[in-house]
Design a protein with these regions (language model features):
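Glycine-rich, acidic/polar active-site loops that bind/position phosphate-bearing ligands
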Residues: 1-169, 174-255
Length: 255
């Protein structure tokens, strides 16, 4: 269509943030200021540190006719009644199998339209649960990556209708099988092109890696309540606690 949409912030007359964009921008600014100060111990010429994000969008595809027969799906985006299917994800055969041709057609159409909008989608594959799939982009600056994810979810619904599908983005639409997570892979980089969480070839670079790793671990330890706050909604709480990633606790794993 001919509409021009652009992200904006929403604040009150007295300056309080009334949306999700303003707190994100403030958080990114705080990370930039703190990380730049630490960088000056190693690289005095660094002027800015950028937070990069690579999200993973998981989703279920359901045939439109089957979707229309389920009022719970229509009203809530998840099943509220019924019985578990005879076959779920016991053998992981969907995860390691080929993508159905009809789904591939949807994915290709989605990717073309996403790229036309500047969304750098890169991967497509099956997920663990039956009829569950995933797409993921190349890393971007975090603020832009969040905008692109919101835009992609809206685009997915429109493209799915063209192919006779309904997209389910609820965290746990079906009982007994995996739900859909939105994993956030993030990193910090400088305006001079240095990946701060990457190991280096010199002792100085490795010291920088250790320092930023320790700072990240300490941040998780001190502020785990704040990290949990934005994801503690009913849908996500319903999904977590089984064998899915991540678990229902905050943890740090160094690989």
């Amino acid at each position: 269509d001919d509409r021009l949409c652009f992200p904006s912030i929403f604040i009150s007359y007295t300056g309080e943030a009334l949306d999700y964009k303003a707190p994100l921008l403030r958080a990114l600014h705080a990370v930039n200021v703190a990380a730049t100060d630490v960088c000056h111990y190693f690289y005095p010429d660094v002027k800015k540190v950028t937070c990069n994000l690579g999200w993973e969008q998981e989703y279920f595809l359901v045939d439109e006719d089957l979707y229309a027969a389920r009022p719970d799906l229509i009203l809530t985006g998840r099943t509220l009644m019924g019985h578990e299917s005879a076959k779920n994800q016991q053998m992981d055969d969907h995860y390691f199998g080929t993508i159905p041709e009809r789904v591939v057609a949807f994915m290709k159409d989605l990717e073309i339209q996403a790229l036309e909008l500047g969304i750098p989608v890169k991967t497509r594959h099956n997920e663990v649960a039956p009829n569950q799939f995933e797409c993921a982009p190349i890393f971007e600056e975090t603020n832009l990556a969040v905008d692109h994810n919101m835009l992609l979810m809206s685009l997915m619904k429109r493209v799915a209708h063209k192919h006779g599908f309904e997209v389910l983005l609820h965290e746990k639409p079906f009982d007994g099988i995996n739900g859909s997570g939105k994993h956030n892979n993030w990193s910090l980089s400088t305006d001079t092109g240095i990946l701060l969480h990457g190991t280096g070839k010199t002792p100085e670079d490795n010291l920088r890696f250790v320092v930023f790793t320790v700072e990240t671990l300490m941040g998780v330890y001190r502020h785990n309540g704040l990290l949990k706050a934005p994801i503690m909604d009913a849908g996500n709480a319903h999904r977590l606690g089984a064998n899915e990633a991540p678990p229902a606790i905050i943890s740090s794993f160094l690989g």
